[in-house]
């Protein structure tokens, strides 16, 4: 037999993708921090709970965190953006708080982390434009492309928390476990 070996230099984006795929394939739970324990944050946490994610809900309001079902970790923090700094590498950050200014602080902190695997925020086109201006003012305009806004995409126009949660769960599964058919690293065989 004959073995062919090919070596290529990988850029940081490809390497991050390989690391995410390796983590998903190994069965390790992917850390997901949901910022906001309101209706949408709760629905997202419930949708992600049975999936291969380790969900932690972070909020400034301990009374809302107390209403979460067992099995979902929670953290009451007066400055939720501090949870971003303490999160493990390759974590996903979902920002769905009740306060736009707080959303901006949390998302900016998450985007400042080069090892953040996913950063998403709930919002409209107007919120997206405001956040892009905010990033430009902070000197982080290059990070805007990494932000998923609105989380879950905009293919379904339904604002019910459970629908948003289903779309977010699907988006995270594709992001972390999907395959890119154009990427030769994912083509192991050609099937008839």
Show which residues each predicted segment covers:
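ADP-ribose/adenylate-binding Rossmann-like module
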Residues: 58, 97, 108-134
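Residue-level detector of alpha-helix initiation sites
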Residues: 38-39, 101, 126
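Short amphipathic alpha-helix with an adjacent loop that forms part of the alpha/beta core around
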Residues: 80-89
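Segments forming oxygen-rich coordination pockets for charged ligands
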Residues: 1-60, 66-70, 85, 171-192
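Short amphipathic alpha-helical segments
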Residues: 45-47, 69-70, 105-108, 132-134
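Adenosine-phosphate binding glycine-rich loop
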Residues: 122-192
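Active-site regions of enzymes building and remodeling cell-envelope glycoconjugates
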Residues: 69-78
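Structural motif
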Residues: 31, 91-93, 118
């Amino acid at each position: 037999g004959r073995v062919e070996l090919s070596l290529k230099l990988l850029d940081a984006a490809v390497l991050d993708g390989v690391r995410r795929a390796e983590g998903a394939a190994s069965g390790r739970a992917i850390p997901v921090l949901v910022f906001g324990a309101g209706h949408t944050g709760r629905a997202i946490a419930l949708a992600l709970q049975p999936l291969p994610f380790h969900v932690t809900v972070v909020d400034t309001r301990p009374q809302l965190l107390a209403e979460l079902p067992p099995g979902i970790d929670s953290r009451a923090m007066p400055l939720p953006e501090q949870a971003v700094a303490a999160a493990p590498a390759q974590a996903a950050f979902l920002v769905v708080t009740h306060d736009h200014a707080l959303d901006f602080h949390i998302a900016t902190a998450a985007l400042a982390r080069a090892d953040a695997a996913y950063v998403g925020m709930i919002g409209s086109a107007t919120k997206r434009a405001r956040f892009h201006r905010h990033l430009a003012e902070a000197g982080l305009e290059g990070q805007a492309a990494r932000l998923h806004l609105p989380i879950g995409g905009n293919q379904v126009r339904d604002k019910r928390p459970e629908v948003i949660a289903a779309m977010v769960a699907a988006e995270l599964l594709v992001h972390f476990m999907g395959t890119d058919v154009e990427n030769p690293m994912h083509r192991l065989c050609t099937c008839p």
